[in-house]
Design a protein with these regions (language model features):
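Sensory/regulatory domains in signal-transduction proteins
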Residues: 2, 6-125
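Signal-transducing coiled-coil/dimerization helices and immediately adjacent hinge/linker segments
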Residues: 128-146
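Short, low-complexity, intrinsically disordered N-terminal peptides in bacterial proteins
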Residues: 1-2, 144
Length: 146
């Protein structure tokens, strides 16, 4: 069950959702819960790059680390801030692993156990560093590698 708090879309622990992508991150399949939270119609999501839901406040460095691991064949778990098609934000705890010819990402509600608050704080600091680098002309991808 989803609710709205400020600009954030909240959902319940029972809302487990997934998507599959090809090796380049293009969405091949998604369940209805994902489509509902992402606020994009299936026709728009299937065939789109997964970064269609990427939030600008999500540190590029986190995605760099995630891609490094999954491309090396290691599963990865991370807290991820997404932006829905209606402009609202939603946080997930994503578990991503390789499957034949692509990846599967299973997402759940982040636990409110103190870790999530710490992650949000760290992400904010990292994103501030990335923005400062961007102001100095460093491309986002390059800043993420530092």
């Amino acid at each position: 069950m989803e609710t709205i708090q400020g600009n954030e879309r909240l959902f319940g622990a029972e809302d487990v959702f997934f998507s599959t992508t090809d090796l380049k991150g293009v969405i091949r399949n998604a369940n209805q819960t994902f489509l509902t939270l992402a606020r994009h119609p299936r026709e728009e999501m299937i065939g789109a790059p997964h970064n269609i839901i990427r939030h600008d406040d999500m540190p590029a460095g986190v995605f760099k680390l995630m891609w490094d691991d999954i491309q090396a064949g290691r599963p990865v778990c991370a807290y991820v801030l997404n932006r829905a098609g209606d402009g609202r934000d939603y946080w997930v705890f994503a578990t991503v692993t390789a499957i034949e010819d692509g990846y599967v990402s299973v997402r759940t509600k982040p636990l409110d156990d103190g870790t999530f608050a710490a992650v949000r704080e760290v992400y904010g600091r990292v994103r501030a560093i990335e923005r400062e680098a961007a102001e100095q002309g460093v491309p986002r991808r390059e800043a993420a590698e530092q």
